[in-house]
């Protein structure tokens, strides 16, 4: 299980192992079938590759273990998405820019290349497709986070819905959305629907 948390530190700050950058140990096991009120223990780190407009490299993620059930959780800084190398904030901002500016995908990629040299069409198309595939999960999470996210009236077609979703998240602030969505649903908004949280 991965739990997102707010942080004022940058990705660069997580490029070395430092416990002070992570929240303190949870006081209760987060797994529903355990949920024992016992302080979890530090259980080392794991490394993952992370790409953003400001950082490209390895970061370290703190792990904790439940002394009762033996399962681990990882504390994920808010700018990380579970199972994605690219920054969740950058993904939201890139897609928002694509839908808002109405520029071609080719032009958008040209603009992104100085900051994200490895990004290409397939990344952006994959992110667009995944959001559409996750529409029901995303809408469910948004409705739980805040009632004003409930779309009233007829169900808009996918592209219009994606644009509206990205506009609202961009106004709310991507950091807040990423952490709140993860805490509310136990998943990333980009999680594969075949995965169990």
Specify the residue positions occupied by each region the protein language model found.
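Short, conserved DNA-binding cores of transcription-related domains
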Residues: 1-81
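Long C-terminal interaction/binding lobes of large macromolecular proteins
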Residues: 1-11, 124, 136-197
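Generic alpha-helical secondary structure signal
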Residues: 13, 18, 49-50, 102, ...
